[in-house]
Amino acid sequence: MSETAKKVIVGMSGGVDSSVSAWLLQQQGYQVEGLFMKNWEEDDGEEYCTAAADLADAQAVCDKLGIELHTVNFAAEYWDNVFELFLAEYKAGRTPNPDILCNKEIKFKAFLEFAAEDLGADYIATGHYVRRADVDGKSRLLRGLDSNKDQSYFLYTLSHEQIAQSLFPVGELEKPQVRKIAEDLGLVTAKKKDSTGICFIGERKFREFLGRYLPAQPGKIITVDGDEIGEHQGLMYHTLGQRKGLGIGGTKEGTEEPWYVVDKDVENNILVVAQGHEHPRLMSVGLIAQQLHWVDREPFTGTMRCSVKTRYRQTDIPCTVKALDDDRIEVIFDEPVAAVTPGQSAVFYNGEVCLGGGIIEQRLPLPV
């Protein structure tokens, strides 16, 4: 193949997806090396932090495949460009998605630059479940073949240039196939469970972790009717649509239906709740998004029909998108949607193609 001599640096996380990605690229004739990124300085020796075990697994896989493993420390870049923004958003009462920020600032910026400049790479590769297709000289981002594992939601900030320099080998496979390949090869990561922790926190307890950096401020929990029914330990621990962990049961006069967070009054440190997962206060007819990133990097003007996800693993929502100005859009859903959360990302699709997205600035509530 013509790509034979091309050098690919695979971001090795110590998980099964990046392990199999490295092997697949070897089979395709690339010159493959691995890179393990250290993005967080463990300052606590907590058992939740799995970085050392992940590095050992990445090294074992590279040894088995006969490829070199480089390591790099991006902790300073991570702190400045991901973590501080993450804390600022929480402080402002919003719910950010750090994995999206990490992909934008670390995996497809710091890693991409380091691989090209320091390691002489032609491409980088990751274990993300997405695909790329080159159309009219521009690379497009497509959903992963395994719709259950598709991760395009987390990669919407990438430009066509970044996608052109990236390979996503497992995006063409389904997860069970990936595990089967790892088992057949005898890789230590074959049965390792997928990480669920936020990228820098690993599997540790989120509330405890956040409390170290942002002092919690307890406040009132009130109903949509204005009745005080409890106390929250800090607005930052709660997100719209949340049901668990509120510590309140049904009220004497009310029903036994569960309570849901419908609003956060940051100014007065009040958590607003209502009963029922389809309460009108939980529903939105649309949203305003900002900090837009379109994969083709063409400015968006006018209006378009497409579908949107306002959180990961959500079913696509048909919608109409209208440009408000250079960096803001209005999105109107065909049907009302529950728990649209400021700080999270709205990501747009045309069929299999991920068009891009933006940060939800505000939700447009159901008219009362």
Curated annotation (Swiss-Prot):
An annotated GO cellular component: cytoplasm
Chemical reaction(s) catalysed: S-sulfanyl-L-cysteinyl-[protein] + uridine(34) in tRNA + AH2 + ATP = 2-thiouridine(34) in tRNA + L-cysteinyl-[protein] + A + AMP + diphosphate + H(+)
Protein localization: Cytoplasm
Residues bound to ATP: G11, M12, S13, G14, G15, V16, D17, S18, M37, G127
GO biological process: tRNA wobble position uridine thiolation
Keyword Membrane: no
Stored CDD domains: MnmA_TRMU-like (cd01998)
Principal location class: cytoplasm
Interaction with tRNA as annotated region, ranges: 149-151, 311-312
Catalytic residues as annotated in Swiss-Prot or TrEMBL: C102 (nucleophile), C199 (cysteine persulfide intermediate)
Cysteine-cysteine disulfides: C102-C199
Enzyme nomenclature, EC number: 2.8.1.13
Alphabetical UniProt keywords: ATP-binding, Cytoplasm, Disulfide bond, Nucleotide-binding, RNA-binding, Transferase, tRNA processing, tRNA-binding
Renumbered residue ranges of the record's region Interaction with target base in tRNA: 97-99
Positions of the record's site feature: Interaction with tRNA: H128, Q344
Recorded GO MF terms: ATP binding; tRNA binding; tRNA-uridine 2-sulfurtransferase activity
HAMAP family noted in UniProt: tRNA_thiouridyl_MnmA
Subunit relationships: Interacts with TusE.
Family, as annotated: Belongs to the MnmA/TRMU family.
Job description of the protein: Catalyzes the 2-thiolation of uridine at the wobble position (U34) of tRNA(Lys), tRNA(Glu) and tRNA(Gln), leading to the formation of s(2)U34, the first step of tRNA-mnm(5)s(2)U34 synthesis. Sulfur is provided by IscS, via a sulfur-relay system. Binds ATP and its substrate tRNAs.
Protein name: tRNA-specific 2-thiouridylase MnmA
Source organism of this protein record: Shigella boydii serotype 4 (strain Sb227)
Lineage, uppermost ranks: Bacteria, Pseudomonadati, Pseudomonadota, Gammaproteobacteria, Enterobacterales
